[in-house]
């Protein structure tokens, strides 16, 4: 895990383009080559999608997803697969963009999380710009939504889409 995190930090440090991590995470290339991501994107709803990603994430990365669901919220916390190892900014940003991008592509809706928080300050503004919400500094690397995600700030039923996630209520 530590070597993977250093690898990502080196990419961030050497890239002259600050938008490169956002483009990488939102490109869709990962879902084309990753069976767990493809399977998750073919889930009947966002909750199942996130649970499947959490189940298989250890196979494709050095971090874990902790998915929590209440009556009003669905959240994903990013946790290092190695206890005590803090996630670098680039990994938190890429994972947030990846998760929101996956839901957007599957639903064909401009979904926006209600909040995003990171343990370390996130200096690259492109992550927050992609998400549509600021990334605040907090005690966890966490993406939170009410219900699932909001669309244009209004409550609205999910219209059928060509993607796999079709039964998605929005707040």
Give a label for each model feature.
Residues 1-74:
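N-terminal low-complexity or simple alpha-helical regulatory segments
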């Amino acid at each position: 895990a530590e070597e993977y995190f250093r690898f990502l930090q080196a990419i961030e440090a050497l890239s002259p383009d600050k938008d490169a991590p956002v483009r990488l995470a939102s490109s869709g290339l990962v879902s084309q080559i990753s069976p767990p991501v493809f399977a998750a994107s073919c889930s009947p709803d966002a909750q199942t999608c996130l649970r499947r990603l959490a189940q298989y994430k250890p196979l494709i990365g050095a971090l874990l997803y902790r998915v929590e669901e209440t009556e009003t919220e669905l959240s994903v916390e990013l946790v290092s697969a190695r206890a005590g190892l803090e996630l670098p900014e680039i990994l938190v940003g890429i994972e947030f963009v990846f998760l929101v991008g996956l839901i957007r592509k599957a639903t064909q809706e401009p979904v926006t999380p209600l909040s995003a928080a990171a343990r370390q300050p996130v200096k690259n503004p492109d992550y927050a710009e992609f998400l549509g919400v600021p990334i605040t500094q907090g005690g966890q690397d966490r993406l939170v939504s009410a219900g699932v995600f909001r669309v244009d700030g209004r409550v609205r039923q999910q219209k059928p889409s060509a993607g796999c996630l079709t039964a998605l209520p929005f707040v």
